[in-house]
Amino acid sequence: MILGAATVSPDVVAWGVGAAILAGGVGIAVLNPPMRAQDEADDAAAERPPRRQWLGARMIAVLTMAFGTTTLLSGVDLAIVATLREAGQVSWAAVVVVVFGLSSVIGGLIYGALSRPLPTWLLLSLLGLVTIPAGLARDWPWLCVAVVGSGLLTAPTLGTVADAVSRLAPPGVRGEVIGLQSSAQSAGFALGSPLVGVAIDLSVPAGGFATAGLAGLAAALTGYLLSRRSPAVPTPTSRRATSDSR
């Protein structure tokens, strides 16, 4: 979005985003995908657990990391444009963004092939760490190289956030929990750009990458500490297994 606003027109970007949101909403309404598996339908119909039962420290930890992930990604977008603008190479921004996007796709495919998932806080920490040195790049070829690390970890981090939310959410409130996740991520996107923009104004474009990476690290640390302080919460699947064994 930032790239489009800088190279095309803010009005065009606004209309494009609005059209995409509308198309997505219509698509979801038409397809009407199920919010729970068939074996969860009876559980959802039986009871709706109170909010204090599922909105505990672990869920807050995941929502915090969802917020931190999108704060970082939004900041990276702005830092890329700022770096290229300083170098007089804004016309190459599309190439850098394409490299970033392809890296994310490749990272998602590689992570999906792993037999054992990694903790969300670990992936977000790695994403923050590899984002900070991207500010050392001064022109578009090196920036393409610098954003590969962040790109490779983007899809896996977003995927583990969504998976964690799904596992922690009881079937009866899964729609509400997904809404909270969406709100947390939207808030991150909204905060990331102005936060990194202030850092760039006060320093250099490299400060934007550093700020974005540190925001991700802070969210990862917060999520880790919250998860460690909270006792393990049984997932809907484990609860059903326990009930069946009885």
How should these model regions be labeled?
Residues 30-71, 241-244:
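Juxtamembrane intracellular "pre-TM" segments in multi-pass secondary transporters
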Residues 120-159:
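C-terminal transmembrane helical hairpin of 12-TM major facilitator-type secondary transporters
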Residues 80, 156-169:
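Intracellular juxtamembrane helix-capping segments at the cytosolic ends
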Residues 52-97:
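Helix-loop boundary and gating motifs at the non-cytosolic
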Residues 6, 105-119, 200:
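Helix-to-loop junctions at the C-terminal end of transmembrane segments
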Residues 173-203:
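A late C-terminal transmembrane helix in Major Facilitator Superfamily
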Residues 6-19, 198-217:
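A membrane-interface helix-boundary motif in multi-pass transporters
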